[in-house]
Amino acid sequence: MGFLRIGGKKLEQAADFLKDSKSLYELMVGRNVSDFRKITQFKNWTIGDVFGHLYVFNIAAVKTLESSAEFDNFFNPILEKLQAGRSFLQAQTPLLKHYDELELFEIWWESSLDVNEKYSNTDPKKRIKWAGPEMSARSSVTARQMETWAHGQEIFDRLGAVRNDGDHIQNIIHLGVATFGW
């Protein structure tokens, strides 16, 4: 029996994650590939690199809801590359090399919708595995929102666009305070 069927309430943080994802989608939809190849201020990543990174970790967030084993099967090859001294970009390349920037943008958006759907219907207190310490589903989707918002800001900055934030970013502020010592 699903969480919502036994009286659970939808996880509002999932909807907030989707708001930040949607603002990025609306900023980039219809742009040509040259925009996705622009270098951001973050480690010389391109806008396309950012979407690749967000996509990979959206997939990881869905895999961990399925099971710890699914997460490990997906994430361990990335972790091995990181432990061998590779960068995140180098570690994620094998997963993304079959997509051009525009295809990657579209699958990132689809993965964002999937994260929202899966986490909306998950018990917020469910404990799930991650690369760092285990966390609640609520913390996991808030971390996805935080990463989407933060990497999104580098895209807004690079394109000279103004972002209109709202109260939904309070989740990010709470997460920052709660994890400051960690």
Question: Language-model segments: what does each one mean?
Answer:
Residues A14-L18, F51, E101-F105, W109, ...:
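Generic detection of long, well-ordered alpha-helical segments
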Residues M1-G2, L24-E26, D35-K38, F88-T93, ...:
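Short amphipathic alpha-helical segments, especially helix-boundary/capping motifs
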Residues F36-K81, W130-W182:
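Short, contiguous alpha-helical
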Residues K22, Y55-V56, L113:
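Solvent-exposed alpha-helix faces
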Residues M1-E12, I59-N116, S120:
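Short, helix-capping/interhelical loops that line the mouth of catalytic, cofactor-
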Residues G2-G52, A61-K63:
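An N-terminal domain-cap segment
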Residues T93-G160:
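Contiguous mid-protein beta-loop-alpha structural module that forms a pocket-lining wall or clamp
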